[in-house]
């Protein structure tokens, strides 16, 4: 009945407007019905559970059903590229050569030797390398002292650097579970129980924690902009969050108990002691947060530009702003901490974040660039029931991604005139009124984010999406699916450290296995990841637009 409906075919303007309103009302009814049906089924399942029964089972039907709605925008964003398979054996290092002889009895009398035909075969050895160290021992009667030779670097305890390296790489790099790591080691002939495997993965990792700190500091210094995202991580059954900070040269992980603005600042400052300042910038943030005018005037009398620690700041609030509510106190502390972060001269300060529009990411940096892919997902979530509205949505989504493609082209060749044109086209595109109410409301919300979505026009080196951080979050999700979550804060720190080193090594083209083995064996022949980040940063110049501004 509604398949052939086209509002443009209705000549009477009032009738056309009335039909449009009725269609939007029908969409609202359909959306409410879907939500009510889902809630009813959830309540039925809960009632059955309370009765000791089971909820409605999920049984796949015999007849094919339409696939669930895909919220990904890969198809719209991607342009097909030609692909050809290259030879891999030409670049392989040869570990050994083996001459395969021909049985002379199989050759005719006139056969003449013509050299060799080379065939490269890849293989790997997985076997034990148990070493009996016979340490020389001397005794000095005059000194009453016994002198014993030390073990080579990397050998400490029952297990050598090979086992330690393999366990760490399998658990953190290959995302294997702890029991499976132990099972694989035992299948290779290693006599090891579950407890020592856990200790190898978590205990005595101070050197790697130090390397992670260096990686993060180098990463923050490598560009004035950073990606940021978060995902959940339970520690010993308690809710927590993992923050992912990255750019093209590194990825760093931080597990915390909260994800508010103060916690995000803790992450960006690498958990150093919090600092606060009462200045004009902080007052502006407090006013924007919604603090009452009376409280704002009280704060204005405290402006002194002096950096304070948390104890001093809390004492100041208790003395001059007594009775401040918990939410108001959080607003004030966050504003003062952000102002102190911007005034910091002792470490790298992130000037722009590429992220989604979560409220805890706002105010922290001078500029904010929103993810276009995340914004596009909002349109994919619209589920119009009326074919006419479906057509309107499809047509606008095509225009949305066509504009996105123009922004991608601008990144490659940024021209001031093109930036002006793209700004005008953005304003035209997101001033569209389709008549489909849900779509028009979403378009208006996108238009309100213009400055953050068009940040690429001022800084062409930043990506248009937050995929690098989201990919980092997916790695934590996979780790969480396999291992559920760390049981201790020491374990959570080990997760953060080794996932940081594994992801960063991959971005820098460094073998994570060889890197871990190099450090555990004590050879330290490979350069540090932090040094590599610094070298690559000079080559890439990830802050070019800031250097010229």
Regions found by a protein language model. Name each.
Residues 1-157, 198, 228, 274-335, ...:
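Short, flexible loop/hinge motifs at secondary-structure junctions
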Residues 109, 361-366, 379-380:
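Short active-site loop/helix that positions an aromatic residue
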Residues 163-174:
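Short, amphipathic alpha-helical "recognition" segments used to contact nucleic acids or chromatin
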Residues 173-184:
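Short, charged amphipathic recognition helices of the HTH superfamily
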Residues 187-190, 194, 199-355, 359, ...:
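RNase H-like nuclease fold core
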Residues 305-329, 348-366, 394-549:
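Acidic/histidine-rich catalytic cores and adjacent linkers
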Residues 368-382:
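Inter-helix linker motif
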